[in-house]
Amino acid sequence: MAAFTPQWNDWCPGCGNFGILNAEQQAIVELGVDTKNVVVVSGIGCSGKIPHFFRTPISGVHTLHGRAIAFATGIKLSNPDLVVIVNGGDGDLLGIGAGHFVAAGRRNVDMVVILHDNGVYGLTKGQASPTLKRGEKPKSLPRPNINDAVNPIALAISSGYTFVARGYAYDVKHLKELIKSAIKHKGLALIDVLQPCPTYNDINTKEWYDKRIYKLDTLPDWDPVVKKPEEVNEKIKRAIDKSLEWGDRIPIGIFYQNELVPSYEERIKANSPAYLDYTPAKQLIEKEGKLTTIIDPLLKEREVD
């Protein structure tokens, strides 16, 4: 298959990253996306290895710790024709990268962010990540965690993400469908993927999740899609309320979707009508060693007396 690679994979046996990788690969293939136009971006952590496991011509970009969203934003705005998928751990995206995570929601760039959510920093021996609940003590910690946890779903919705979902790494078929929906969505999409870390997190295990997870689309009255502006507040409230459900039952599926909000690309075009026809990736910036882009007139135009 076009997305798969024979590259040897050194994740721990049973790691949820295998399911996430598999779901991403299947989603890309089933959507029939031109693989030359797919870019997979990651930060640092166990999830950071994901770009290495996609076959060329899919492009992979392994970036700095916490900066995957920033890199991906630049890639997408330079060439809006690309399908850009960000992968990052809960520590990478919600710890050092939290500022970029929130700022991205205000822009609504048309790309997908996949959050690998296992409650620990798996690459550095299992320290508590921003999504580990206060008071929990996985085997990697000498004492219970004293910090409160971030709620990725609520944070994404309140920041402005227009597609917000939660998946489960061991339900690859369901996760694949969420990723396909996120790619097709026009705007910024987050998928918070619950994934067991069999090496360091002995609380949120496969057995623990299997007894609790249920799908939102099995609820008869669940409809996360905003169809008119008057519905926004109601849909947001329901989504955030449902995101707080954690314990005996944990919902997965689409929490919120709103395509009435213009993407960042559309907002740029409103100011620069030629943007989508003449994107930065198509522009010649130098010829025979000399710059062809002269910004002096642009700066002059924006001078303030």
Swiss-Prot record:
Its cofactor is [4Fe-4S] cluster; thiamine diphosphate; Mg(2+). Gene3D superfamilies: 3.40.50.970. The record marks 125 as: Plays an important role in the binding of CoA. Keywords: 4Fe-4S, Cytoplasm, Iron, Iron-sulfur, Magnesium, Metal-binding, Oxidoreductase, Thiamine pyrophosphate. Pfam families: PFO_beta_C, TPP_enzyme_C. [4Fe-4S] cluster binds at residues 12, 15, 46, 197. Changing residue 123 to A/I: Strong decrease of the oxidoreductase activity with pyruvate, 2-oxobutyrate and 2-oxoglutarate. InterPro entries: 2-oxoacid:Fd_oxidored_beta, 2-oxoacid:Fd_oxidoreductase, OFOB, PFO_beta_C, THDP-binding, TPP_enzyme_TPP-bd. Binds 1 [4Fe-4S] cluster per subunit. NCBIfam families: Oxoac_fdxbeta_Archa, PorB_KorB. Heterodimer composed of an alpha and a beta subunit. This is 2-oxoacid:ferredoxin oxidoreductase subunit beta. It comes from Sulfolobus sp.
